[in-house]
């Protein structure tokens, strides 16, 4: 519940907390590893680390964060101060996104005894022009996201060593004798994928602001079944980079993020790589594959399914770019 501080009537403060059955070091490590947040926290879509802190001694970080709030994608720049010894992380938005005029706070990881931790998440914020409607909007977003982040942090930390089996990263690449811009165009224009890719049967794409795309896609499997996924993509044309986060994932997964990277090789070719970061859902694995299914079996099946679709997309992107160069 937000309250107004006595010394600054327009500044609101909130506190959320949760108890986690995991050591402080494990919990703090997940909070400190901000590049891994999209795989842990539901609201976080993507994080660019602009300035990095020393992982052992702490210090300041500068970040650019994209996250969902009240159903919309917001982007802002934040500075964090990490203190590994105290198990705290201070944060302050340096370039907020309207209707936020200012936003900051702190993560605290306290010992709760017997190898457990208490996590406290503090926020303070102001709305642009102290608008009451905006204050209510921000309050709802802070409350919803804080509860979601703490629950996700608890789940990830309490997985312990099992998390190493459930969480994995892989990639597929193609070398293209074409222009990076043409490869990017193919990947960016996902609205045309149903006409260009055999495994995409339907795709609705909206772009409310340049570079931020919402995708609702039906993918056809080799057995004829159709699977629906929804995603948010953040596109960086100047960097040859598209990152995405699936909001609706297949039953065996609890999370899936990825990125398309386009890298000029200097000899007239480019390397295009599709990266996937996947977290399996143990209960979902049992539902999808049977009660005796192991994480290793699920990893292999997910790797094959996602890798097959990515490789197909990469091959068609290569053909598109190479044919464009041949016509030039």
Region locations from a protein language model:
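Hydrophobic beta-strand positions in extracellular immunoglobulin-like domains
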Residues: 20, 123-125, 176, 219, ...
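Generic structural detector for well-ordered beta-strands
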Residues: 17-19, 48, 81, 108, ...
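Glycine-rich portal/gate segments that line the openings of hydrophobic small-molecule binding cavities
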Residues: 3-7, 35-39, 46-99, 191-197, ...
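Hydrophobic ligand-binding cavity/cleft-lining segments
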Residues: 1-58, 139, 147-209, 328
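Beta-strand/loop substructures that line and gate deep hydrophobic ligand-binding cavities in soluble
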Residues: 2-7, 11, 62-70, 75-77, ...
């Amino acid at each position: 519940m937000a309250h107004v501080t006595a010394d600054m009537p327009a500044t609101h403060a909130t506190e959320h907390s949760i108890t986690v059955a995991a050591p402080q070091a494990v919990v703090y490590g997940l909070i400190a590893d901000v590049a891994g947040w999209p795989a842990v926290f539901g609201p976080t879509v993507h994080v660019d680390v602009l300035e990095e802190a020393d992982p052992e001694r702490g210090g300041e970080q500068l970040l650019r964060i994209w996250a969902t709030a009240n159903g919309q994608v917001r982007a802002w720049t934040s500075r964090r101060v990490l203190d590994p010894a105290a198990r705290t992380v201070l944060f302050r938005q340096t370039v907020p996104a309207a209707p936020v005029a200012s936003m900051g706070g702190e993560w605290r990881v306290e010992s709760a005894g017997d190898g457990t931790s208490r996590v406290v998440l503090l926020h303070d914020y102001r709305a642009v022009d102290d608008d009451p409607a905006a204050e209510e909007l921000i309050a709802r977003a802070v409350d919803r996201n804080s509860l979601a982040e703490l629950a996700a942090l608890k789940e990830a930390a309490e997985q312990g060593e099992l998390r190493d089996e459930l969480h994995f990263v892989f990639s597929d690449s193609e070398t293209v004798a074409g222009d990076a811009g043409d490869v990017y165009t193919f990947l960016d224009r996902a609205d045309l994928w149903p006409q260009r890719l055999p495994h995409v049967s339907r795709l609705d794409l909206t772009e409310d602001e340049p570079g931020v795309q919402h995708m609702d896609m039906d993918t056809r499997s080799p057995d004829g079944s159709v699977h629906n996924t929804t995603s948010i993509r953040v596109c960086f044309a100047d960097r040859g980079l598209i990152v995405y986060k699936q909001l609706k994932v297949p039953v065996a997964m609890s999370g899936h993020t990825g990125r398309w990277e386009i890298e000029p090789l200097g000899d007239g070719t480019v390397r295009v790589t599709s990266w996937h970061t996947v977290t399996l859902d143990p209960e979902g694995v049992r539902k999808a594959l049977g009660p005796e299914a192991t994480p290793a079996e699920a990893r292999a099946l997910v790797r094959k399914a996602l890798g097959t679709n990515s490789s197909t997309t990469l091959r068609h992107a290569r053909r598109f770019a190479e044919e464009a160069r041949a016509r030039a």
